[in-house]
Amino acid sequence: MPPSLPSRTEAGTLVAVTLAVVGAWRPWVRKIPVRTADGSLVSTSELVQGLRAGIHGLDMFVVFGALVAVLGTLIARRYDVSPAPFLVAASVLILWAASTMLAEYRSVERYEPELGVYLTLAGGLVLLVLGVARGVKVAVRRRRGERTGPAT
């Protein structure tokens, strides 16, 4: 039997995970140069998490969350269960990592958040919406006595 097409939840999960991982790869912050008394611009030399491109620091939580979402969706498809718990758990990890760093960046005037942190937040929010929507759909169908698997 040929494999079925991915559901909207599966396609949305792929989009969300892509947003989160691409966001984790990109820089999350940049330093704003400070003007000295003589008028020249100087950048501080401290290393800030998220300053460089690549996976390091809290990005590991984003990657782990993305893996939870993908593996949970595959498990849900294979065993005909809802992927909602996996998607919500993944979104919590991703949103925690990105929002923690965004709050830290905004608390210091010399740092400006970059596109990466916003892409990661968007991916986490999409996963959260997908997980909650799927959970509500399953709850409504159970209440009505209908089939609740992800194929519906």
List the predicted regions and their residue ranges.
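Compact integral membrane and secretory-pathway proteins
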Residues: 1-152
